Amino acid sequence: MITEIMKQVEIFTDGSCLGNPGPGGYGIVMRYKGTEKTFSEGFNKTTNNRMEMLAAVVALRKLKEPCSVILTTDSQYVRQGITQWIHGWKKRDWKKADKKPVVNADLWKQLDAESERHKIDWRWVKGHAGHRENEMCDELARTAAENPTQDDTGYPG
């Protein structure tokens, strides 16, 4: 019996926002078999949390097949949201315990859908603490935020 072995991919993400809300960007470092690729994009008006989430969505979307992923973020919002809070939100039809709509539900739904395709180990690293890939992502995200080219169509402001 032949068992398909999933590719092992490391993903590092970060989001940045100048003002919050304000111009924002995301940075991604992806590593597969020792080869690194970087991605970034800037948006005219958004929030830091939306950029943190979008970084993870975009990175997972770039994987052409189901993979075993270690995804490292400095955002507790993203890590806790996708591993803990989302289960209750889905049961309550994307409402929080206080019955208010989940903020950034558009991106949570996308992140949930992308996550379903992969086996993901969600990891947290302290930001601005000398973690090589996190620092790379931070620089990519800040540079993108300083040079925005896109509109965040999901941001209500």
Curated annotation (Swiss-Prot):
Belongs to the RNase H family. GO terms for cellular component: cytoplasm. Its EC number is 3.1.26.4. It catalyses: Endonucleolytic cleavage to 5'-phosphomonoester. Coiled coil: none annotated. One of its GO terms (molecular function) is nucleic acid binding. InterPro entries: RNase_H, RNaseH-like_sf, RNaseH_domain, RNaseH_sf, RNaseHI. It comes from Aliivibrio fischeri (strain ATCC 700601 / ES114) (Vibrio fischeri). It is an enzyme of class 3 (hydrolase). This is Ribonuclease H. CDD domains: RNase_HI_prokaryote_like. It comes from the Bacteria. It is found in: Cytoplasm. Monomer. SUPFAM superfamilies: Ribonuclease H-like. Its cofactor is Mg(2+).
